[in-house]
Each structure stands twice: as structure tokens, then as C-alpha cells.
Amino acid sequence: MLIRKKIFFFIASLSFPVTVVIAQTASSKQDKYVFSVAQDGTGDYKTIQQAFDAVPYRNKKPVTINIKNGIYKEKLLLDSTKDFVTLTGADKFNTILTYNDHTGKLSPKGDTINTRTSWSFKILADNFSASNITFQNDAGFSAGQAVAVESDGDRTRFTNCRFIGNQDVLFTNNEKSRQYYQQCYIEGTTDFIFGSATVWFEQCHIHSKKNSHVTAASTPPDKKWGYVFNDCILTGDTSLHNVSLGRPWRPYAAVVYIHCFIGEHIKPEGWSNWNNTDNYKTTRYAEYKNYGPSADPLKRVTWARQLSDEEVKEYNLQKFLSNFIPAKNKTP
């Protein structure tokens, strides 16, 4: 059994997608829980929420939930008492978690849904991780704010996942939260990455579907960092040429793009002030050695910065996320 445990933890630490099936034995229960979800009844549960509910109250042990392919139309909540959960899909294109709530829609209880209640999946737990899954809000292009994932917990990690929707797709909520997204695909229309958390995006593909804004950070003034995009690719639909890298949801929004490909959909000036010139004085927008058709630093707004070689050294992954990422540090 000792050998099998070592193999499991080695595989779980790899960054590329791996599907692992491990039998749940009496001895393994002492160290972790492994559940499976399958809509056809071949797993431990038919729905993901059932698997979440099976996680022990105030859990302190690793729980792995393996999800078989399927479209799981559920409004999912991972409670704050359900820490240390790992969600693993069989295939990121065919393991789809989706729902269709949006602002203005009535909930089953008769309440009017708003941005903060429109989520398809809300994570309140700490130490959550996911890989090989599509997270989606399929409310539609004209539905308004419709969150696919609201991530509130601390030390959350997504690897090789897809986030699909339109406006307000990925809500990185909670100013005390630290989050890491590695090799993920995120697409949307307006402010589709937004919130107050400290977040590092590593080698992600960010795709715009409308002439609007990629980010809407609300970084608190006392937080040194907000969003960092490192070695990412920014693309847009072919008809787009007026997308901004971000606009400040709050005055001290902090967003940095480092070594990123900036597609021609991004407007030359790069950034938006959200129609408030006072934001010139407080926003913390910067870039470093980006490349691509819309990466010319000479055309950027004067109130955004280009980092120096010395300044960029501060953007150290382990330092940025206070050492919760186990992988080797990569300094830009």
C-alpha cells in the first residue's frame, strides 16, 4: 500500500492532464477519500452535488472526485466546511459543468438573480483544485451578467480547464483569496475575468467575443498585487479591434501582463478608465515585454506603465501566492 500511495501523490503533482482510477480501500480511507461521479450510474454518485455533500463536515483530509464524461447541468455549491477537494474530469472537452442563471432571471424561490447569485459553480472551500473540466454558464450572449465560476476560497488551483460564457464569466471573489490558473482557456465578452482576489494566470489562453473589456479587477488599495498574466495568449473573434486589457471595477485595480501575446483585437491604447479620469491616479496597470500585433508600448495610455527589468523581478510566483503553489517557481 505504501508504494501505491507514493505513485498516487506523484501523479497528482503533475501539471498535465492525467486520468487516474484508484480503488477505494479500507486502508486508503484513513488518508483520503476517492469518489466517482457518472450520469449512467456506474460511479458512486450520479450528480456532482451529491459527491460534494458526501465530503465530511469540516473536512481536513484530501478528497478526490473523479467525474466521467457528460454534461452536468447543476447549480453547484462547495461549502466552506468542505476543504481539500480535488475535482478531476475525464476530458476537458467532454466533462462539462454548466447552468444558465443570469441577472434578471427569477430563482425557484422567486428572488431576482443578480451577478452575485448567477453562478453555475460557487467555491467557498479552501484548498480546492480542479483539472480537465469545462466550467460554463450557457445563459446566452445577450443574457447580461452570468457567472460560470465564483471562486471565494483561499488557495484554489485550476489546471487545464475551460471557462465558457459571456459577461462576468470568472468571478475571482474575496480579497483574501489566492488563486492559480495554469494552461486554462477562458472566453467571454465583457469583464469576463473580474474580482478582488490575488490571481496568477500561467500560460492561459484568453479569448474575447465582443468589443469590450477582458478584466475588471477590484483590487483593494492595501493589496500589492491583483491579477498577473504570465506567458498567456490573448485572442479575439476576427471582427474585433476595440477590446481593452482591463477597466477598473474599483479605483486601485492592479493588473499586469508579462510576456503575453497581444492579438490585434486589443485596441492600441490598451486600457480603459471606465469613464472616470480620477482612475488615472490610482489604477495599477502595467506590462512587460509583451509581443504581437497590439503590443506596441508607445501607443499605450500614459497612465499605464511598462515595467523595468528590475521591477519585474518582484513578480515571483512563489512570492506572489505566498508559497501555496508546490511546483517549481518560474520567474518572468
Predicted segments, located by residue:
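Sequence-level preference for short, compositionally simple segments enriched
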Residues: 25-332
